[in-house]
Every structure is written in C-alpha cells, then in structure tokens.
C-alpha cells in the first residue's frame, strides 16, 4: 500500500468516526461491503452501480474514496471489523426472526467493542461509532446502555 493509499484510507476512517460522511453513502457502502464479503463475483457490477449512482453528485469524491478503502483493504482495523462482523452473522444464520437477529447484533456489538479497545482499556470511539452506525443502518433502535458498557 502506498503512502497516498494509506492517506486515503485514513481520511475515510476519520470521516466515519466524525460522522462527516453522508449517512446515505455510508448505508450504500455497507451494502457494497456485504456484497464484497459474501458475493465477490458480483462485486464489480455493484461497484460500478455505486460509482454511477454518485457520478453526478457532490458525493462522488466520497464514493470514490470509499471504493478505494474497500478495494485496498486497510492493513488493520476496518477490514478486520467487517470480516469479524460478517463471519459472526453468518454463524448466527442471519436469522429471519427479528428478536433473534437483534440479539446477535447486541452481542456482536459488544464483542467488537471489547476486542478493539484502546491499549489503555478505554473504548475505541471509531469502532463504537461504526458498530452503532451499522446497527442504525439495520433499522434497529436500541438503548446504548443495553449494547455497550461505557
């Protein structure tokens, strides 16, 4: 990974963490990520559709950066989180039963936040915000106390 590529990913990570990335783009990116992890043979079509969708909008710059972040694969955090999350949900069966599924999201949110704590033991805010955004993306409202112990 070149310096420029690393810089592009770092910028994307900062945008996720500071919520400066347009949320509808984040939603679409999560869909694209699932496609990437589950159906890599269909990824090219999804990627093209994603870029075309934002080609005439102010969001195009963000869209291109997100694609780069996904394709390059960061040397650590974001790819690890997505892979862990997706593997967990596959084991869980991605149940149709909403309550069952909701339980999976809660447990896995805790697991990810625990796994990626800072060295001093404090919560990693980037991971926390990413998990919460993923849960919001899935359309579930939850009390933060039931998901994460501060």
Regions found by a protein language model. Give the residues of each.
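Short terminal alpha-helical segments
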Residues: 7-68, 82-89, 147
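Short, solvent-exposed segments of well-ordered alpha helices
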Residues: 16, 20-27, 72, 76, ...
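Amphipathic, heptad-repeat alpha-helical segments
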Residues: 75-96
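Extended amphipathic alpha-helical elements
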Residues: 3-5
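Short runs of predominantly hydrophobic/aromatic residues within well-ordered alpha helices
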Residues: 22, 26, 78, 82-85, ...
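Residue-level detector of alpha-helical secondary structure
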Residues: 30, 34-37, 67, 71, ...
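Repeat-associated, polar segments at repeat-unit boundaries in modular proteins
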Residues: 54-75, 126-146
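Amphipathic alpha-helical binding modules
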Residues: 101-150
């Amino acid at each position: 990974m070149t310096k420029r590529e690393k810089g592009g990913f770092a910028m994307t990570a900062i945008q996720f963490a500071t919520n400066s990335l347009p949320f509808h783009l984040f939603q679409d990116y999560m869909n694209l990520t699932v496609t990437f992890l589950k159906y890599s043979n269909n990824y090219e079509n999804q990627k093209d559709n994603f870029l075309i969708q934002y080609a005439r909008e102010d969001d195009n710059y963000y869209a291109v950066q997100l694609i780069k972040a996904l394709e390059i694969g960061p040397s650590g955090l974001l790819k690890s989180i997505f892979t862990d999350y997706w593997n967990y949900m596959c084991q869980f069966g991605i149940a149709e039963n909403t309550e069952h599924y909701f339980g999976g999201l809660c447990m896995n949110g805790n697991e990810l936040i625990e796994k990626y704590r800072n060295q001093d033991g404090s919560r990693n805010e980037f991971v926390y915000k990413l998990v919460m955004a993923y849960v919001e993306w899935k359309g579930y409202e939850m009390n933060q106390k039931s998901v994460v112990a501060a």
